[in-house]
Amino acid sequence: MNSPLAAGTSAAPVTWTEPAREAAFGAWLQAHAAEHTLAPESVRLASADASFRRYLRVDTTSGASRIVMDAPPDKENSEPFVRIAALLREAGLHVPEVLAWDQAQGFLLLTDLGQDTMMARINPEDSAAAAPMYRQALDALLAWQLASRPGVLPAYNEAVLRRELQLFPDWYIAQHKGVALSEAQSATLTKTFDLIVLRCLAMPTGYVHRDFMPRNLMVRPDGETPATPAQALGVLDFQDALHGPITYDIASLMRDAFLTWDEDFVLDVTVRYWEKARKAGLMDFEDWHSDFGAFYRAVEWMGLQRHLKVAGIFARLTLRDGKAKYLADTPRFIHYIRSTAHRYRELGPLLKLIDEIEGLQAASGWAFGRV
Protein backbone atom coordinates (compact mmCIF):
# COMPACT_ATOMS: atom_id res chain seq x y z
CA MET A 1 0.00 0.00 0.00
CA ASN A 2 2.02 2.89 -1.29
CA SER A 3 1.70 6.63 -1.31
CA PRO A 4 1.72 8.31 -4.72
CA LEU A 5 5.01 9.60 -5.93
CA ALA A 6 3.70 13.11 -5.99
CA ALA A 7 1.76 13.12 -2.73
CA GLY A 8 2.03 16.29 -0.77
CA THR A 9 4.16 19.34 -1.45
CA SER A 10 7.08 18.47 0.75
CA ALA A 11 10.38 20.21 0.08
CA ALA A 12 12.20 18.16 2.69
CA PRO A 13 15.92 17.66 2.11
CA VAL A 14 17.10 14.26 1.02
CA THR A 15 18.86 12.22 3.69
CA TRP A 16 20.85 9.05 3.08
CA THR A 17 21.70 6.24 5.46
CA GLU A 18 24.30 4.75 3.12
CA PRO A 19 27.08 7.08 1.90
CA ALA A 20 27.87 4.75 -0.99
CA ARG A 21 24.31 4.98 -2.32
CA GLU A 22 24.29 8.74 -1.89
CA ALA A 23 27.46 8.98 -3.96
CA ALA A 24 26.08 6.63 -6.61
CA PHE A 25 22.89 8.67 -6.85
CA GLY A 26 24.79 11.93 -7.17
CA ALA A 27 26.95 10.55 -9.96
CA TRP A 28 23.94 9.05 -11.77
CA LEU A 29 21.91 12.25 -11.59
CA GLN A 30 24.83 14.35 -12.76
CA ALA A 31 25.36 12.02 -15.71
CA HIS A 32 21.79 12.68 -16.88
CA ALA A 33 21.68 16.38 -16.01
CA ALA A 34 22.70 17.75 -19.39
CA GLU A 35 20.46 15.51 -21.50
CA HIS A 36 17.38 16.23 -19.37
CA THR A 37 18.29 19.81 -18.33
CA LEU A 38 18.27 18.86 -14.65
CA ALA A 39 19.38 21.07 -11.78
CA PRO A 40 20.86 18.48 -9.36
CA GLU A 41 21.16 20.98 -6.52
CA SER A 42 17.34 21.27 -6.43
CA VAL A 43 16.73 17.64 -5.40
CA ARG A 44 14.30 17.25 -2.50
CA LEU A 45 12.05 14.55 -1.12
CA ALA A 46 8.70 14.21 -2.89
CA SER A 47 7.35 11.24 -0.92
CA ALA A 48 8.16 7.90 0.61
CA ASP A 49 5.82 4.94 0.56
CA ALA A 50 4.99 1.74 2.35
CA SER A 51 7.79 -0.11 0.59
CA PHE A 52 11.51 0.69 0.50
CA ARG A 53 11.00 2.97 -2.50
CA ARG A 54 11.03 6.70 -2.22
CA TYR A 55 10.52 9.49 -4.70
CA LEU A 56 12.56 12.64 -5.15
CA ARG A 57 11.70 15.76 -7.12
CA VAL A 58 14.29 17.66 -9.15
CA ASP A 59 13.84 20.87 -11.13
CA THR A 60 14.82 21.40 -14.73
CA THR A 61 16.49 24.54 -15.99
CA SER A 62 13.31 25.33 -17.97
CA GLY A 63 11.23 25.58 -14.80
CA ALA A 64 9.57 22.17 -14.99
CA SER A 65 10.31 19.27 -12.66
CA ARG A 66 11.04 15.56 -12.84
CA ILE A 67 10.66 12.68 -10.42
CA VAL A 68 13.45 10.29 -9.46
CA MET A 69 12.54 6.90 -8.04
CA ASP A 70 15.10 5.61 -5.55
CA ALA A 71 14.53 1.85 -5.38
CA PRO A 72 17.47 0.00 -3.78
CA PRO A 73 17.85 -3.12 -5.95
CA ASP A 74 18.49 -5.39 -2.99
CA LYS A 75 15.04 -4.45 -1.62
CA GLU A 76 12.95 -3.36 -4.61
CA ASN A 77 12.73 -4.62 -8.18
CA SER A 78 12.12 -1.64 -10.45
CA GLU A 79 11.49 -3.72 -13.59
CA PRO A 80 7.73 -4.21 -12.98
CA PHE A 81 7.24 -0.44 -12.73
CA VAL A 82 8.86 0.10 -16.13
CA ARG A 83 7.04 -2.79 -17.78
CA ILE A 84 3.60 -1.97 -16.37
CA ALA A 85 3.99 1.75 -17.10
CA ALA A 86 4.35 0.74 -20.75
CA LEU A 87 1.22 -1.43 -20.53
CA LEU A 88 -0.80 1.41 -19.02
CA ARG A 89 0.45 3.83 -21.65
CA GLU A 90 -0.49 1.36 -24.40
CA ALA A 91 -3.96 1.15 -22.82
CA GLY A 92 -4.30 4.92 -23.19
CA LEU A 93 -3.82 5.96 -19.57
CA HIS A 94 -1.89 8.95 -18.27
CA VAL A 95 1.15 7.59 -16.43
CA PRO A 96 4.71 8.77 -15.80
CA GLU A 97 7.06 8.37 -18.74
CA VAL A 98 10.34 6.63 -17.96
CA LEU A 99 13.08 8.98 -19.21
CA ALA A 100 16.06 7.06 -17.84
CA TRP A 101 16.49 3.80 -15.95
CA ASP A 102 19.47 2.23 -14.25
CA GLN A 103 18.17 -1.20 -13.30
CA ALA A 104 21.39 -2.29 -11.64
CA GLN A 105 21.37 0.67 -9.25
CA GLY A 106 17.61 1.12 -8.95
CA PHE A 107 17.35 4.72 -10.15
CA LEU A 108 14.60 5.94 -12.51
CA LEU A 109 14.00 9.39 -13.97
CA LEU A 110 10.30 10.01 -14.62
CA THR A 111 8.04 12.74 -15.87
CA ASP A 112 6.25 14.52 -13.03
CA LEU A 113 2.45 14.28 -12.96
CA GLY A 114 2.28 17.06 -10.40
CA GLN A 115 1.47 17.33 -6.73
CA ASP A 116 -2.33 17.39 -6.81
CA THR A 117 -3.84 14.02 -5.94
CA MET A 118 -7.50 13.20 -6.29
CA MET A 119 -7.43 12.54 -2.55
CA ALA A 120 -6.26 16.09 -1.86
CA ARG A 121 -9.17 17.46 -3.90
CA ILE A 122 -11.80 15.43 -2.07
CA ASN A 123 -13.95 16.80 0.71
CA PRO A 124 -15.22 13.67 2.51
CA GLU A 125 -18.36 15.57 3.45
CA ASP A 126 -19.23 16.46 -0.16
CA SER A 127 -19.70 13.42 -2.38
CA ALA A 128 -21.43 15.50 -5.06
CA ALA A 129 -18.27 17.53 -5.60
CA ALA A 130 -16.19 14.36 -5.75
CA ALA A 131 -18.47 12.58 -8.22
CA PRO A 132 -16.94 14.03 -11.43
CA MET A 133 -13.49 12.82 -10.39
CA TYR A 134 -14.84 9.36 -9.67
CA ARG A 135 -16.39 9.28 -13.13
CA GLN A 136 -12.98 10.15 -14.55
CA ALA A 137 -11.46 7.35 -12.50
CA LEU A 138 -13.98 4.92 -14.00
CA ASP A 139 -12.94 5.93 -17.51
CA ALA A 140 -9.31 5.18 -16.69
CA LEU A 141 -10.18 1.90 -14.99
CA LEU A 142 -12.27 0.66 -17.90
CA ALA A 143 -9.58 1.54 -20.43
CA TRP A 144 -7.10 -0.45 -18.35
CA GLN A 145 -9.40 -3.45 -18.08
CA LEU A 146 -10.34 -3.43 -21.75
CA ALA A 147 -6.65 -3.65 -22.68
CA SER A 148 -6.29 -6.91 -20.73
CA ARG A 149 -4.55 -9.84 -22.36
CA PRO A 150 -3.89 -13.20 -20.71
CA GLY A 151 -0.34 -14.21 -19.97
CA VAL A 152 1.03 -10.66 -19.78
CA LEU A 153 0.86 -10.04 -16.03
CA PRO A 154 1.34 -12.58 -13.22
CA ALA A 155 -1.86 -14.33 -12.17
CA TYR A 156 -3.79 -13.27 -9.09
CA ASN A 157 -4.16 -16.95 -8.31
CA GLU A 158 -5.13 -19.01 -5.29
CA ALA A 159 -1.64 -18.94 -3.81
CA VAL A 160 -1.54 -15.13 -3.90
CA LEU A 161 -5.06 -14.76 -2.52
CA ARG A 162 -4.30 -17.11 0.38
CA ARG A 163 -0.93 -15.56 1.13
CA GLU A 164 -2.59 -12.17 1.39
CA LEU A 165 -5.42 -13.43 3.57
CA GLN A 166 -2.94 -15.02 5.96
CA LEU A 167 -1.60 -11.57 6.79
CA PHE A 168 -4.75 -10.95 8.81
CA PRO A 169 -4.30 -13.69 11.44
CA ASP A 170 -0.51 -13.48 11.38
CA TRP A 171 -0.15 -9.73 11.77
CA TYR A 172 -3.45 -8.13 12.74
CA ILE A 173 -4.77 -10.75 15.15
CA ALA A 174 -1.61 -12.30 16.57
CA GLN A 175 0.83 -9.39 16.47
CA HIS A 176 -1.35 -6.27 16.72
CA LYS A 177 -4.21 -7.54 18.88
CA GLY A 178 -2.06 -10.06 20.76
CA VAL A 179 -4.75 -12.72 20.47
CA ALA A 180 -4.01 -16.43 20.27
CA LEU A 181 -6.85 -18.00 18.31
CA SER A 182 -8.57 -21.06 19.69
CA GLU A 183 -8.85 -24.18 17.57
CA ALA A 184 -12.45 -23.31 16.78
CA GLN A 185 -11.56 -19.74 15.82
CA SER A 186 -8.76 -20.94 13.56
CA ALA A 187 -11.20 -23.33 11.91
CA THR A 188 -13.59 -20.42 11.34
CA LEU A 189 -10.90 -18.45 9.55
CA THR A 190 -9.86 -21.44 7.46
CA LYS A 191 -13.43 -22.07 6.33
CA THR A 192 -14.02 -18.37 5.67
CA PHE A 193 -10.84 -18.03 3.66
CA ASP A 194 -11.84 -21.08 1.62
CA LEU A 195 -15.17 -19.42 0.81
CA ILE A 196 -13.53 -16.12 -0.14
CA VAL A 197 -10.96 -17.76 -2.39
CA LEU A 198 -13.61 -19.90 -4.07
CA ARG A 199 -15.75 -16.84 -4.82
CA CYS A 200 -12.83 -14.76 -6.07
CA LEU A 201 -11.41 -17.43 -8.35
CA ALA A 202 -14.82 -17.89 -10.00
CA MET A 203 -14.92 -14.27 -11.21
CA PRO A 204 -13.93 -13.13 -14.71
CA THR A 205 -10.43 -11.73 -14.90
CA GLY A 206 -8.45 -8.87 -16.38
CA TYR A 207 -5.70 -6.45 -15.49
CA VAL A 208 -5.78 -5.46 -11.81
CA HIS A 209 -4.01 -2.31 -10.59
CA ARG A 210 -4.34 -3.44 -6.94
CA ASP A 211 -4.22 0.04 -5.37
CA PHE A 212 -6.65 1.96 -7.57
CA MET A 213 -7.72 4.71 -5.19
CA PRO A 214 -7.67 8.53 -4.88
CA ARG A 215 -4.22 8.68 -3.29
CA ASN A 216 -2.80 7.11 -6.44
CA LEU A 217 -4.75 9.18 -8.95
CA MET A 218 -3.43 12.57 -10.00
CA VAL A 219 -5.49 15.59 -11.06
CA ARG A 220 -4.11 17.43 -14.07
CA PRO A 221 -3.04 21.06 -13.62
CA ASP A 222 -5.71 23.63 -14.46
CA GLY A 223 -5.82 24.33 -18.17
CA GLU A 224 -4.23 21.01 -19.15
CA THR A 225 -6.65 19.16 -21.42
CA PRO A 226 -6.51 15.36 -21.66
CA ALA A 227 -6.44 13.78 -25.10
CA THR A 228 -9.12 11.26 -24.08
CA PRO A 229 -11.45 10.80 -21.08
CA ALA A 230 -9.26 7.92 -19.88
CA GLN A 231 -6.35 10.36 -19.53
CA ALA A 232 -8.16 12.90 -17.34
CA LEU A 233 -6.44 11.53 -14.23
CA GLY A 234 -2.86 10.39 -13.86
CA VAL A 235 -2.32 6.89 -12.50
CA LEU A 236 0.48 5.94 -10.10
CA ASP A 237 1.60 3.06 -7.87
CA PHE A 238 0.89 0.38 -10.44
CA GLN A 239 4.02 -1.75 -10.08
CA ASP A 240 2.20 -4.56 -8.25
CA ALA A 241 -0.41 -5.09 -10.98
CA LEU A 242 -1.64 -8.63 -11.64
CA HIS A 243 -4.15 -10.42 -13.86
CA GLY A 244 -7.11 -11.26 -11.65
CA PRO A 245 -10.75 -10.62 -10.72
CA ILE A 246 -12.17 -7.58 -12.49
CA THR A 247 -14.08 -6.70 -9.32
CA TYR A 248 -10.90 -5.86 -7.42
CA ASP A 249 -10.16 -2.32 -8.58
CA ILE A 250 -13.73 -1.02 -8.25
CA ALA A 251 -13.79 -2.46 -4.72
CA SER A 252 -10.48 -0.74 -4.00
CA LEU A 253 -11.75 2.57 -5.39
CA MET A 254 -14.99 2.64 -3.42
CA ARG A 255 -13.88 0.96 -0.17
CA ASP A 256 -10.88 3.21 0.18
CA ALA A 257 -8.03 2.54 2.57
CA PHE A 258 -8.02 6.16 3.75
CA LEU A 259 -11.52 7.45 3.05
CA THR A 260 -15.03 6.19 3.83
CA TRP A 261 -18.07 7.10 1.74
CA ASP A 262 -21.70 6.51 2.63
CA GLU A 263 -23.42 3.55 1.02
CA ASP A 264 -25.52 5.65 -1.37
CA PHE A 265 -22.44 7.16 -3.00
CA VAL A 266 -20.64 3.82 -3.15
CA LEU A 267 -23.64 2.29 -4.90
CA ASP A 268 -24.05 5.24 -7.26
CA VAL A 269 -20.46 5.08 -8.53
CA THR A 270 -20.45 1.28 -8.65
CA VAL A 271 -23.68 1.26 -10.69
CA ARG A 272 -22.10 3.73 -13.11
CA TYR A 273 -19.10 1.45 -13.44
CA TRP A 274 -21.37 -1.57 -13.99
CA GLU A 275 -23.33 0.23 -16.70
CA LYS A 276 -20.17 1.26 -18.55
CA ALA A 277 -18.58 -2.16 -18.12
CA ARG A 278 -21.76 -3.86 -19.33
CA LYS A 279 -21.75 -1.81 -22.53
CA ALA A 280 -18.06 -2.66 -22.98
CA GLY A 281 -18.74 -6.39 -22.70
CA LEU A 282 -17.09 -6.90 -19.31
CA MET A 283 -20.26 -8.09 -17.56
CA ASP A 284 -20.91 -11.14 -19.75
CA PHE A 285 -20.66 -13.55 -16.84
CA GLU A 286 -23.51 -15.53 -15.28
CA ASP A 287 -26.26 -12.98 -14.56
CA TRP A 288 -24.02 -9.94 -14.05
CA HIS A 289 -25.15 -8.38 -17.32
CA SER A 290 -28.77 -8.15 -16.19
CA ASP A 291 -28.45 -8.12 -12.41
CA PHE A 292 -26.44 -5.38 -10.72
CA GLY A 293 -27.06 -7.03 -7.36
CA ALA A 294 -25.26 -10.18 -8.46
CA PHE A 295 -22.28 -8.13 -9.61
CA TYR A 296 -22.26 -6.05 -6.44
CA ARG A 297 -22.22 -9.14 -4.26
CA ALA A 298 -19.11 -10.27 -6.12
CA VAL A 299 -17.54 -6.86 -5.51
CA GLU A 300 -18.24 -7.23 -1.80
CA TRP A 301 -16.61 -10.67 -1.62
CA MET A 302 -13.57 -9.41 -3.49
CA GLY A 303 -13.48 -6.34 -1.26
CA LEU A 304 -13.57 -8.57 1.81
CA GLN A 305 -10.40 -10.31 0.66
CA ARG A 306 -8.73 -6.94 0.22
CA HIS A 307 -9.90 -5.59 3.58
CA LEU A 308 -8.53 -8.60 5.46
CA LYS A 309 -5.25 -8.33 3.59
CA VAL A 310 -4.81 -4.61 4.14
CA ALA A 311 -5.61 -4.81 7.86
CA GLY A 312 -2.77 -7.30 8.10
CA ILE A 313 -0.45 -5.20 5.95
CA PHE A 314 -1.09 -2.06 7.98
CA ALA A 315 -0.33 -3.93 11.20
CA ARG A 316 2.88 -5.29 9.67
CA LEU A 317 3.94 -1.87 8.44
CA THR A 318 3.63 -0.56 11.97
CA LEU A 319 5.06 -3.45 13.94
CA ARG A 320 7.78 -4.68 11.60
CA ASP A 321 8.66 -1.64 9.51
CA GLY A 322 8.14 1.13 12.06
CA LYS A 323 5.58 3.04 9.96
CA ALA A 324 3.05 3.75 12.67
CA LYS A 325 0.84 6.11 10.63
CA TYR A 326 -0.83 3.19 8.84
CA LEU A 327 -2.25 1.59 11.97
CA ALA A 328 -4.60 4.53 12.50
CA ASP A 329 -6.60 3.42 9.46
CA THR A 330 -7.11 -0.21 10.51
CA PRO A 331 -10.48 0.52 12.22
CA ARG A 332 -11.80 1.50 8.79
CA PHE A 333 -11.02 -1.98 7.49
CA ILE A 334 -12.52 -3.69 10.51
CA HIS A 335 -15.67 -1.69 9.81
CA TYR A 336 -15.64 -2.80 6.16
CA ILE A 337 -15.08 -6.43 7.18
CA ARG A 338 -17.84 -6.44 9.79
CA SER A 339 -20.32 -4.66 7.53
CA THR A 340 -19.78 -7.14 4.70
CA ALA A 341 -19.81 -10.15 7.02
CA HIS A 342 -23.12 -9.00 8.50
CA ARG A 343 -24.73 -9.14 5.07
CA TYR A 344 -23.98 -12.77 4.23
CA ARG A 345 -25.10 -15.78 6.24
CA GLU A 346 -21.97 -17.72 5.27
CA LEU A 347 -19.90 -15.00 6.91
CA GLY A 348 -21.75 -15.07 10.24
CA PRO A 349 -18.92 -17.02 11.93
CA LEU A 350 -16.39 -14.43 10.70
CA LEU A 351 -18.52 -11.62 12.11
CA LYS A 352 -18.69 -13.42 15.46
CA LEU A 353 -14.92 -13.93 15.45
CA ILE A 354 -14.20 -10.28 14.63
CA ASP A 355 -16.59 -9.13 17.33
CA GLU A 356 -14.87 -11.39 19.86
CA ILE A 357 -11.46 -9.98 18.94
CA GLU A 358 -12.62 -6.36 18.84
CA GLY A 359 -15.17 -6.48 21.66
CA LEU A 360 -17.84 -5.02 19.37
CA GLN A 361 -21.51 -5.56 18.66
CA ALA A 362 -22.86 -6.72 15.30
CA ALA A 363 -22.98 -4.10 12.55
CA SER A 364 -26.13 -2.87 10.84
CA GLY A 365 -27.09 -4.11 7.38
CA TRP A 366 -26.44 -2.66 3.96
CA ALA A 367 -28.55 -1.67 1.00
CA PHE A 368 -29.54 -5.12 -0.26
CA GLY A 369 -30.37 -6.72 3.07
CA ARG A 370 -28.94 -9.99 4.37
CA VAL A 371 -28.35 -12.72 1.81
Language model features with spans:
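Active-site activation/catalytic loop segments of kinase-like enzymes and analogous catalytic loops
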Residues: 169-176, 246-286, 301-321, 333-340
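ATP-binding pocket architecture of kinase catalytic cores
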Residues: 46-47, 56-163, 167, 173-178, ...
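An alpha-helical support segment within catalytic cores of ATP-dependent transferases
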Residues: 25, 31-34, 149-154, 160, ...
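Catalytic activation segment of kinase domains across protein kinase-like and atypical kinase folds
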Residues: 215-260
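Conserved catalytic-loop position in the HRD/HxD motif
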Residues: 211
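ATP/Mg2+ or Mg2+-diphosphate-binding catalytic cores
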Residues: 3, 309-371
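Hydrophobic packing residues in well-ordered alpha-helices of helical domains and bundles
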Residues: 81, 130-137, 161, 186-189, ...
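Conserved NTP-binding catalytic cores of kinases and kinase-like/nucleotidyltransferase enzymes
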Residues: 1-107, 116, 206, 220-234, ...
